[in-house]
Curated annotation (Swiss-Prot):
The gene is ZPBP2. This is Zona pellucida-binding protein 2. Belongs to the zona pellucida-binding protein Sp38 family. Residues 1-28 form the signal peptide. May be implicated in the gamete interaction during fertilization. Its main location: secreted. It comes from Gallus gallus (Chicken). Keywords: Cytoplasmic vesicle, Glycoprotein, Secreted, Signal. It is found in: Secreted; Cytoplasmic vesicle, Secretory vesicle, Acrosome.
Length: 352
């Protein structure tokens, strides 16, 4: 921080004022809680015929079904729509799960005598292919013959989550010049302050990155400025332990934490403006540019989930569980292909 006489000094000293302000900000505990994102009208989405949470099979193709985490699936019907309108003689139903084993007696599988399946309390590990075989008879009255018929219906069921919120933050600081090593040190110190501001929320700062530009500004000469960007996300170490203590899913909680963290950081920079005007006789060489703080919300997916509007067209924008052979280690928003021969199961955060 520059002292009397207007001499430029180190970025560490320039940040002393920020540290003092940070202490005040941390004690204030400001910030209104974030609004919970409204749940969709239907928690389950299907490609096939859709009638009040009932999905019929199709002998020609597998039906894709998307079930929100910790909710119950629609009723999966072991026949197609046209057959359901007919009289069925001596029907027998047999359901198998993704592991190829019969679902009879499984606690999470609610089976009815009419061949319907509901999956209860859906989780990512329950994703996969559910297959039903319908055996019945057709009586040819003219020939007095009975024909045994066996139809197979396949449902690909995927867990999905609502997107989490990540915030892209942009700020600007003045600098003495663009070639100084002090700029990088300043940005690293700034990151430490941001992380300490929001550490109790188990939120983290990803980045930051910066570029330095020389500007032509009226009445200011040709100053240099640091254009700094970073992301605020709710996935700092400890977030999984926090979520495990909640009774069900914690998207609403993580979204509220990310919003509060961003509000704290915004308040911190607003206090910088006040400090520069009222607490410094000499403006530091590196200081915040008033009004440069801006926030852009970015939807992201939790590790193990990703978005793919081509593969999952009927659930565009959903964070769908990563399929076997893919993984998502962070909140980047997409599932990556595993490079090795060994493949992970559904919802992988890393490759084996």
């Amino acid at each position: 921080m520059a002292g009397g006489g207007g001499r430029p000094c180190s970025p560490q000293r320039a940040l002393l004022g920020m540290v003092a302000i940070m202490a005040v900000v941390a004690e204030a505990r400001w910030g209104a809680p974030g609004r919970a994102r409204a749940a969709p009208e239907e928690d389950q989405i299907s490609v096939g015929f859709f009638r009040k949470n009932v999905i019929y099979g199709n002998v020609r193709r597998a039906e894709n079904v998307y079930v929100k985490m910790f909710t119950n699936s629609p009723s999966l019907v072991c026949m197609d729509l046209s057959l359901s309108q007919e009289e069925i003689i001596d029907p027998k139903y047999s359901w198998t799960g993704p592991d190829g084993r019969n679902l009879e007696g499984r606690g999470y599988a609610n089976l009815t005598g009419s061949g319907e399946l509901m999956l209860v309390g859906f989780q990512e590990s329950m994703s996969g292919a559910y297959t039903c075989t319908l055996s019945h008879r057709i009586i040819e009255t003219s020939a007095q013959e009975e024909v045994d018929v066996r139809d197979t219906y396949r449902f690909m069921v995927y867990a999905y989550r609502e997107a989490n919120h990540v915030y892209q933050v942009s700020v600007r600081f003045t600098a003495k010049g663009c070639e100084l090593a002090a700029n990088a040190r300043f940005v690293e110190e700034l990151k430490k302050i941001m992380e300490s501001l929001i550490s109790d929320l188990t939120c983290g700062v990803k980045g930051p990155s910066y570029r330095c530009h020389s500007l032509e500004a009226p009445h200011r000469g040709s100053p240099s400025e640091l254009f700094i960007t970073f992301q605020v996300n709710p996935f700092a170490p400890g977030w999984e332990d926090l979520c495990s203590r909640l009774p069900q899913d914690c998207e609403d909680t993580t979204n509220r934490r990310a919003q509060e963290a961003t509000e704290r950081i915004g308040e911190f920079f607003r206090k910088q403006t006040y400090a520069l005007k009222h607490q410094f006789q000499t403006v530091p060489t590196i200081h915040y540019v008033e009004g440069s703080f801006s926030v852009t919300p970015i939807d992201s997916c939790r590790p193990g989930f990703g978005r793919n509007n081509i593969t999952h067209r009927s659930c565009a924008g959903c964070c769908v569980v990563c399929s076997p052979g893919t993984y998502s280690p962070d909140s980047a928003g997409s599932c990556r292909v595993c490079a090795g021969r060994r493949t992970a199961g559904y919802g992988a955060k890393s490759c084996p």
